[in-house]
Amino acid sequence: DSSLSGRITNTVNPAPLSKESFALKRTPEYVIQLTPWQIITKNGGKAAGVDIDRDIIKLSVVERFKSTGHIGTALLSGYGLKRGAVATTVAHDSHNIIVAGVSDSDMTAAVNRLKELRGGMVVIDNGKIISELALPLGGLMTFLSAYETADRINKLRDAAHSLGVSDNIDPFMTL
């Protein structure tokens, strides 16, 4: 049934974005401190904004189902990213878009690319796609074989680590 197909493959519908979409609502802002090899976080204090020297970048959740324009942006430490952005639609528990980035323009490019892919995982640097995996089925699954999917995920991880993501952090599942 074509209506079912559309409902399954058209689930990534964020409102139109600009780099201003990722502005912090207040400063200083609390920092979420990652713990290596875990999903547990700590209070990392406060910071005025992105500070690469202190390993502080932006982390945003972008509503993707109803184009509400709801975006929550915080600061993140312990991820290691030195440039670019990493984004995914595989984001337990809500599966909204999660994007971590050094620059608002790369974060915007990453979210826009996920919309074009109808979901997935993407690594962006200086506005260019470094690596990606389309997950058009609900923003969570692909039509690719398990072998091809595993290969793409390995390339995504390598790309994220090449931009500085710490070796003790899974670039996507940690988000």
Can you say where each PLM-predicted feature lies in the sequence?
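Active-site microenvironment of metallo-dependent hydrolases
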Residues: 1-175
